[in-house]
Regions:
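RNA-binding basic/glycine-rich loop and surface signature characteristic of RAMP-family CRISPR effectors
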Residues: 1-351
Length: 351
């Protein structure tokens, strides 16, 4: 069975504008920016795109964990990374698509284009971050006045919100590459295969992909030490993840204020509905919903479920979480304690 890290987070921000959508078309003012929001039913919810969350994550890995990020190549109207998951950990964990063709000369001396596209499905998958409760978005009108003459007005959206998100990491996919002629699975070309083997990668049979004769295709797996380091850094980065628009005047802490982590023998994401809106239209974490998920997936959860909460956020949950943690399958502590204890368990689960 496929083992995946499964994570659920709540972040809590005040007077923020974490991900903007460009010019505000609801006003005639030229210098006005709108935040990203989406309509659900007849209510508006502020959100951060999954791409933006990934950008924060990747940038944190570069700055806090010294990841050497894959250089970006720009050609005409396209841009892509080096598509080298052996050398660059972000190409491995975040995936890539490098669509390209090169000119070759065939056996008859004729020149033709050959497809050399490389793609990789990201082992790290994540949702958008979206406010749990409907969001009242305020327009803040400001002006630049530190000059002679008329002031220059500008506007921006701001909001307060508790936002939820979920993510997963495929433990067996991280650091493991295929060369199957299929979109998302053509991870390596011959040069990269050789590079992987030069780095002591293991060549192994693909349990799912076969050639026309029924023979298994090959996978190339990096050493366990390398794979473990990349996965561990990715999870641990949540302790210090930072980012978001308008940070100069609207600084916000985007680290989790509540987190749930476990390893699941499935690629399913079971934690999507752990947060809900209460009668006062405020965000609320549902312990009964968590208990139901843990019970329903008890045959697929490997090891314990780790819960972390930052003191000062949803303090009303403290007693219930402590009581729940008397269950041997549940760990409860601070955010960083939960992340670090989960990593200890995960290290034993990586193939």
């Amino acid at each position: 069975m496929a083992k995946t890290v499964q994570g659920f987070v709540l972040i809590d921000v005040d007077v923020a504008a974490l991900n903007n959508a460009g010019k505000d078309t609801s006003t005639t003012m030229d210098n006005a920016v709108a935040t990203k929001k989406i309509l659900k039913g007849n209510k508006w919810y502020a959100y951060v795109s999954g791409q933006a969350w990934r950008y924060w994550w990747r940038d944190t890995l570069k700055r806090e964990f010294n990841w050497k990020l894959s250089p970006i190549v720009r050609e005409k109207k396209t841009a892509f990374t080096q598509a080298d998951p052996v050398t660059f950990p972000d190409d491995d964990i975040f995936g890539y698509m490098r669509a390209a063709k090169e000119e070759i000369t065939d056996s008859k001396g004729k020149k033709k284009k050959q497809n050399i596209t490389l793609t990789r499905v990201s082992p790290l998958k994540n949702s958008a971050l979206i406010s749990v409760a409907p969001t009242k978005i305020e327009k803040n009108w400001s002006s630049m006045t530190r000059h002679e003459g008329d002031a220059v007005p500008f506007g921006k959206d701001e909001y307060c919100a508790t936002m939820k998100g979920m993510f997963s990491i495929a433990l067996e996919q991280a650091g493991t590459f295929s060369s199957q002629e299929r979109t998302g699975f053509k991870n390596l070309n011959e040069k990269l295969k050789n590079l992987a083997m030069d780095n002591n990668a293991e060549e192994m049979d693909d349990p799912f992909a076969m050639d026309a004769k029924g023979n298994p295709l090959k996978l190339y797996r990096l050493q366990k030490k390398t794979r473990l380091e990349r996965i561990r850094d990715t999870v641990k980065a949540l302790e210090v993840i930072n980012g978001g628009a308008m940070q100069t005047n609207n600084m916000a802490d985007v680290t989790p204020k509540l987190i749930v982590l476990t390893t699941l023998n499935s690629a399913n994401h079971p934690f999507s509905h752990l947060a809900k809106i209460n009668a006062a239209e405020k965000a609320e974490f549902s312990i009964p919903a968590l208990k139901q998920v843990v019970q329903d997936y008890s045959d697929r959860i490997e090891g314990r479920v780790f819960i972390g909460r930052r003191m000062g956020f949803m303090d009303e949950l403290e007693d219930d979480f402590k009581e729940y943690s008397t269950n041997d399958k549940i760990f409860y502590g601070s955010i960083n304690q939960a992340i670090r204890e989960y990593i200890k368990q995960m290290e034993m689960q990586i193939p």
